[in-house]
Amino acid sequence: MILIVDDQKDTGTALERLLRYAGHEAVSVTGGAEALTMLHIRKPSLLVLDVNMPEMDGLTVLRTIKEHDELKDVRVAMYSADTNPETETEARRLGAVDFLVKGTVGFDKLVARLCELAGEPEKLSAA
């Protein structure tokens, strides 16, 4: 299962649908606290995490995950419109496996990359 966390519900839902279309189980939530609750119920193969969110930003969520022994092995890819190099550096220092900037890659390549990071190859051919 790939868990998507984005405060922009349309973005999370669109990515969830694309991943499902590619043959993967995907769930989207709109906040960091909700994501942490979900992580304690079921650990995903990949957490796709936005940076700029109200209440609890993505870096705080990532830091919290890595501080908990039962969650620290969850793979996290940041997916954000934030282009500040310091944000990416901090995310990687905290343990993010990738930092993808929204709008810089097509959805087909994005889905392929997320599936690769999750260790789940796409189940539909590109034909």
What are these regions (language model features)?
Residues 6, 50, 80:
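Active-site residues of response regulator receiver
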Residues 9-27:
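Two-component/phosphorelay signaling modules centered on CheY-like receiver
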Residues 28-37, 58:
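Helix N-cap/capping motif at the beta->alpha junctions
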Residues 37, 59-72:
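Short amphipathic alpha-helix used as the core "switch/output" element in two-component signaling
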Residues 42-48:
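Active-site beta3 strand of CheY-like receiver
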Residues 53:
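Receiver (REC) domain active-site loop signature in two-component systems and cognate sites
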Residues 58, 67, 90-98:
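As written
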